[in-house]
Amino acid sequence: MPRPAAQVPVLEVSRLRIAREAKVILRGLSWRVEPGQHWVILGPNGSGKSSLLAALTGYFAPTSGTLAVLGETFGRSDWRELRRRIGLVGPSVAAMIQPAEPALAVVAGGVDGLINLWRRPKPATLALARRLLRLLKVGGLAARPWGHLSQGERQRVLIARALASDPALLILDESCAGLDPVARAEFLVLVKRLPKLKPGLAIVFVTHHIEEILPVFTHALLLRNGSALAAGRMADVLKPAALSKLFGRKVRLTKGRAGWSLDVAGK
């Protein structure tokens, strides 16, 4: 009997394996994200985070296992249509935007998952784009070319673009990379607001920095060498023993008013 629509998971991965030539990138990963959950994917460089995201967005075909996003199974559905229901913020999107593209056009393109628009969007689309830019506190940048935006401004514009299609899932891929300390702090404040800006939105935040994990995140997936070391509620997963195994060094984990911090024991 089919599962009721309200209970369909946002993501459901079962024994997912990705290999290219002789290299195994993901090793039998199983993972599930329910509507409204806010996940962190934490892992060192080379752990398989980028390959997992590429698979989730249909750009990397699994070698074996099953992958379902918003009830659609990879290999049985049109992933091009599905991408419109997934908001993606990350370097892969930013790299495709032409320097001359105005911020307003960048956001407007998010409605249909397009980049570098070649014709003027409909008035309703432009109105939505302006509203989202204002919501993200960059309404005054609508006419500014992409190439003239700071890194922090670009991240806000990209989030506005990602929200333009009214997604059920928002993926933030290493979104703090390249930000100076002030811009990073401001960006994390924005991330903290996202659940209120769009209630019910499932969020996947990818990082290898423990200090970027905010209280709004409810769950964590720890990835190392293509395998899941742990996955579940934050309180059950984010523990010194698991993080020591994740990073290959004994670590101390502390949580203060400013958030989490990680120290290598014996430094």
Feature-to-residue mapping (PLM):
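Conserved catalytic motifs of ABC-family nucleotide-binding domains
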Residues: 166
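Conserved ABC ATPase "signature" region
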Residues: 123-141
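H-loop (His-switch) and adjacent beta-strand-loop-beta switch element
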Residues: 220-233
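Conserved ABC ATPase signature
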Residues: 145-149
